[in-house]
Amino acid sequence: LAASSLLGDMLKKQRAEGRMIAAICAAPAVVLYPLGLLGDEKTSGYPAFQRRLDEANRTEERLRVGEKLITAAGPGVAMEFALALAEILKGKEKTTELAKAMLVEGSRCNA
């Protein structure tokens, strides 16, 4: 993904238009950072890749929901990441219904 100029162009356009970008695992460090798309935003990501980021961009949070950037640490956080995206796109009520239907306990939606 990091080598894809098509993806890079799409992400740069997304950022320029002020639209949301979401990335999980190594993607913040190996895709977004080299493209200059992080700005001064904190990002979570897979711990082994976080050291590639500037100190200002690093956080140890499992899930980081910023104004226009959502990042997650890795595969173990995938459900939290998905529910955070669902909440942004469809709202808390719909996301709570979804989490309950999927038997997801302890999510930020049904806490």
Question: Model-predicted segments: where are they?
Answer:
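Active-site-adjacent pocket-lining segments in enzyme domains
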Residues: 1-111
